[in-house]
Amino acid sequence: MPIIKTAGIISKPNSTAAEEIVPKLIEWLRRRGIAVRIDEQTSLYSGGVSGMPREEVPQSCDLVVVLGGDGTLLSAARAIGRREIPLFPVNLGGLGFLTAISIEELYPELERALRGEHRIAKRKLMTTEVIRENNVIASFDALNDAVLTKSSIARMIDLDTYVDEQFVCAYKADGLIIATPTGSTAYSLSAGGPIIFPSVPAICLTPICPHMLTNRPVLVPETSVIRVASRGPDESVYLTIDGQVGTPIREHDTVVCHSSHHSLLLIRPPRMMFFDVLRQKLKWGER
């Protein structure tokens, strides 16, 4: 990682922990000659430092510190977009599966990161496009997943699904989760999907409550192009990206998902390994 000249800070809203940390963190960085850019939420905790829209924070940054939970990290990832700037995620939330650095570890681990004594985990992004009448009307990059669900009342939806032009099936279910390896430990896991090691080049199709005993989750290569078309009435289906943004899907729209050429860079302490986090955060393998 290059020398850190400018660092960004993105924070969780309404967080007493962030309110306590932010002024000290800004001062800590400035004492080391590092310029600081903060979002408008963080400015509320800063004691007078002006903020900017979250999407502008990563501009000119060499590193972005994220103070919050996994939801804050997903929001920060969306703000960073395709810039591939390292994120230093500090857990102020609950589970904190991705934001696995604790408050107590903040300054020691940040000091190590500034010295280059850290590990960068690359998490592949997934591009999702909505095609309507042969035009791309919406495009998103997902870290975790793209989820197609019924938009309102409790009813099943019909989703014609293809992988590389090969017909998979017509899912009749509450929805369909298209998950990256990173997203395999999120919504997909709750819906019965497998845990995928982060470096495995795959995409997982996990139906939500399918009305068919044989509709099990399916892994496909990350080189695959997945196409899903709704057969329901207009706007009976909703597409959600990483649980935070989305758009209604009309009948005959096609949702196309494929692996992006870009990755999210997560700073990890050298000792922090995937299965350690599984055991600590998800109690995986406990008896």
UniProtKB/Swiss-Prot annotation:
Gene coding for it: nadK
Q: Kindly identify the residues recorded as the active site.
A: D70
Superkingdom, according to UniProt?
Bacteria
Q: Which GO terms describe its molecular function?
A: ATP binding; metal ion binding; NAD binding; NAD+ kinase activity
Q: Which Gene3D superfamilies match?
A: Probable inorganic polyphosphate/atp-NAD kinase, domain 1, Probable inorganic polyphosphate/atp-NAD kinase, domain 2
Q: Which InterPro entries match?
A: ATP-NAD_kinase_N, ATP-NAD_kinase_PpnK-typ_C, NAD/diacylglycerol_kinase_sf, NADK
| EC number(s) per entry | 2.7.1.23
Mention one GO biological process in which this protein takes part, according to its record.
NAD metabolic process
The catalytic activity, as recorded, is:
NAD(+) + ATP = ADP + NADP(+) + H(+)
Q: Where in the cell is it found?
A: Cytoplasm
The cofactor named in the record is: a divalent metal cation
Q: Establish whether keyword Cytoplasm is in the entry.
A: yes
Q: Where, by residue number, does NAD(+) bind?
A: D70, G71, N144, D145, R155, K172, D174, T185, A186, Y187, S188, L189, S190, Q244
What name does this protein carry? NAD kinase
Family recorded in the similarity comment: Belongs to the NAD kinase family.
A cellular component term (GO) from this record? cytoplasm
- Key words, A-Z: ATP-binding, Cytoplasm, Kinase, NAD, NADP, Nucleotide-binding, Transferase
**Would you indicate the residue range of the signal peptide?**
none
Presence of keyword NADP:
yes
- Cited SUPFAM superfamilies: NAD kinase/diacylglycerol kinase-like
Q: What is the lineage of its organism?
A: Bacteria, Pseudomonadati, Acidobacteriota, Terriglobia, Bryobacterales
**Role of this protein:** Involved in the regulation of the intracellular balance of NAD and NADP, and is a key enzyme in the biosynthesis of NADP. Catalyzes specifically the phosphorylation on 2'-hydroxyl of the adenosine moiety of NAD to yield NADP.
